[in-house]
Amino acid sequence: MEFLDIFNEGKQYRKEFYSLYQEAFPEAEKKPEALMEALTAQGKMEMLAIAEEERFIGLVINMLAKKAALLDYFAISPDIRSGGYGGRAIQKLLERFQGQKYIFEIEMQDETAPNAEDRRRRKKFYLRNGLKETGILANVYQTDFELLTPDGELTYEEYTDTLRAVLGEEGVRVLAPSLIREK
């Protein structure tokens, strides 16, 4: 399994990458492709195809700051989900960012949400694959998130500093992050 930049060595997967991005994430949570491409050109984001044996498996989009990285989007192709690819990809990502702060945003658990079961399943998946709760809940772009890291250590300030380093003050203003709870 390898991660390939869709603008360089992974350009043959670009069409599948964007197709999965459009399909896998709610409209309200998607960033404009032009913004992500601009951030990638600036070295503040990476857009990676997950491939194995020359087959497209999924996508990873990371925000990159000097002191931390943030997993912005992660998806496995629907036709191969539950095949162990997601867990293997997460393990490789954790190895890749070992020794660096690596932040994961997951939708906050909410039994009344229409996708409550999906949220439960996603959280179990991430915890099973080595992530830990930080105790931080934040509202970002009108969505409630729980923040996870490999070591369970994070402050809300580190989180917002990471967003600011990647998106700038204007981007943070648009996202309008607010703290719901910190441990």
Label each region the model flagged.
Residues 22-52:
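Active-site rim helix/loop that mediates acceptor-substrate recognition in acyltransferases
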Residues 67-78, 105-107:
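Conserved acetyl-CoA binding element of GNAT-fold acetyltransferases
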Residues 1-32, 146, 151-165, 172-182:
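Short amphipathic alpha-helix that is part of the acyltransferase structural core
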Residues 76, 82-96:
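Conserved acetyl-CoA-binding loop-helix of GNAT-fold acetyltransferases
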Residues 114-116, 121-145:
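Conserved catalytic-core motifs of GNAT/GCN5-like acyltransferases
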Residues 49, 55-63, 70-75:
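Conserved beta-strand in the GNAT
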